[in-house]
């Protein structure tokens, strides 16, 4: 109700300014004790972790983990922060975020703007949140792709003791050549190296933190087969399906529809759900799947579950539907 009143004002602002203002308003409401949405318990076990409910916040909304406590008040079963990189970086030039309200869509080319992994850890330590926290890791834009593994290792080692699970993001279209890590020897080397280090860290801390891969929706059936085989070979703990798409289907003739970047929101639902279905058929339940992409209703969250997801995540849907979407999704899922 409150969001439906605030939305016209927020949509009158530049998208990035509205994003900042929304988080600021959430923080203030949380501090005043006004931010507590009651969501039914629906315990879901995934990757050896019991989630209070299967609906999470996707990475990208809180890149630096600076708003965890306020976001927790919306009733999410888990929160994923990031994408974080070893060193701070400003991301791509503005404007880099575009609403397409006619299609309930967003195009972004943010470029992993963040304050760096050390600042994120400071924020996590300052948070009172004791729920399930995913940390999404990436590489710096100026790190050559052939040295990308080094950046992921730095982040993995630093966040390991602060995360419930760690997501390896190799699917953003907004960092040059990043998606090349989804194929061939590059993926093999990345997964092999990170898995070996994960096991060493588990021994060091006497605590196992699951490792999750996040992939793009713009994959062929052959890509799905290859990635699935790699996930099984290296015993990766989970897969997030999917990130944003490079396709412009559904927005090509709309204002901002041809801006470069990743498309999210309603137009990516079918594409990401089909990708999810393909991975589910290939992996046959051996690795749990987290469905994300275009969820704007409880029915769509349930559809992700029917396509093979154990958990779902939302982000763009929150912008168009508001925080009640969390409750709708939890109620619709089994």
Swiss-Prot record:
Keywords: Cell membrane, Flavoprotein, FMN, Membrane, Oxidoreductase, Pyrimidine biosynthesis. Catalyzes the conversion of dihydroorotate to orotate with quinone as electron acceptor. The active site is at residue 172. Its cofactor is FMN. Transmembrane segments: none annotated. Belongs to the dihydroorotate dehydrogenase family. Type 2 subfamily. Pathway: Pyrimidine metabolism; UMP biosynthesis via de novo pathway; orotate from (S)-dihydroorotate (quinone route): step 1/1. It catalyses: (S)-dihydroorotate + a quinone = orotate + a quinol. It is an enzyme of class 1 (oxidoreductase). Binds 1 FMN per subunit. GO terms for biological process: 'de novo' pyrimidine nucleobase biosynthetic process; 'de novo' UMP biosynthetic process. This is Dihydroorotate dehydrogenase (quinone). The keyword Cell membrane applies. One of its GO terms (molecular function) is dihydroorotate dehydrogenase (quinone) activity. FMN binds at residues 59-63, 83, 136, 169, 214, 242, 265, 294, 315-316. Its EC number is 1.3.5.2. It is found in: Cell membrane. InterPro entries: Aldolase_TIM (IPR013785), DHO_dehydrogenase (IPR050074), Dihydroorotate_DH_1_2 (IPR012135), Dihydroorotate_DH_2 (IPR005719), Dihydroorotate_DH_cat (IPR005720), Dihydroorotate_DH_CS (IPR001295). Pfam families: DHO_dh. Signal peptide: none annotated.
């Amino acid at each position: 109700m409150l969001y439906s009143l605030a939305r016209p004002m927020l949509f009158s602002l530049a998208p990035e300014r509205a994003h900042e203002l929304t988080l600021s308003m959430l923080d203030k409401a949380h501090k005043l004790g006004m931010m507590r949405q009651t969501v039914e318990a629906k315990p879901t076990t995934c990757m050896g972790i019991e989630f209070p409910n299967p609906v999470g916040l996707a990475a990208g909304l809180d890149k630096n983990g600076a708003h965890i406590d306020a976001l927790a008040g919306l009733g999410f079963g888990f929160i994923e922060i990031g994408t974080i990189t070893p060193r701070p970086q400003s991301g791509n030039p503005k404007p880099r975020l575009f609403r397409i309200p006619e299609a309930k869509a967003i195009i972004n080319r943010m470029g992993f703007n963040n304050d760096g992994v050390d600042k994120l850890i400071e924020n996590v330590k300052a948070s009172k949140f004791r729920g399930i926290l995913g940390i999404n890791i990436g590489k710096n834009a100026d790190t050559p792709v052939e040295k990308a593994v080094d950046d992921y290792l730095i982040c993995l080692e630093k966040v390991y003791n602060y995360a419930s699970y760690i997501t390896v993001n190799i699917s953003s279209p907004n960092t040059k050549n990043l998606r090349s890590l989804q194929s061939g020897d590059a993926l093999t080397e990345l997964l092999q190296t990170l898995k070996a280090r994960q096991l060493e860290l588990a021994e060091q801390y006497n605590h196992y933190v699951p490792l999750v891969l996040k992939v793009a929706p713009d994959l062929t059936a052959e890509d799905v087969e290859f990635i699935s085989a790699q996930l099984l070979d290296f015993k990766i703990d989970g897969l997030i399906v999917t990130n944003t798409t490079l396709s412009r289907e559904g927005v090509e003739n709309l204002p901002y529809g041809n801006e470069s970047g990743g498309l999210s929101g309603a137009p990516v639902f079918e594409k990401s759900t089909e990708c999810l279905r393909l991975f589910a058929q290939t992996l046959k339940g051996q690795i749990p799947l987290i469905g994300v992409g275009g969820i704007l209703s409880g029915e769509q969250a349930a559809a992700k579950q029917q396509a093979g997801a154990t958990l779902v995540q939302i982000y763009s849907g929150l912008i168009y539907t508001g925080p009640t979407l969390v409750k709708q999704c939890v109620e619709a899922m089994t």
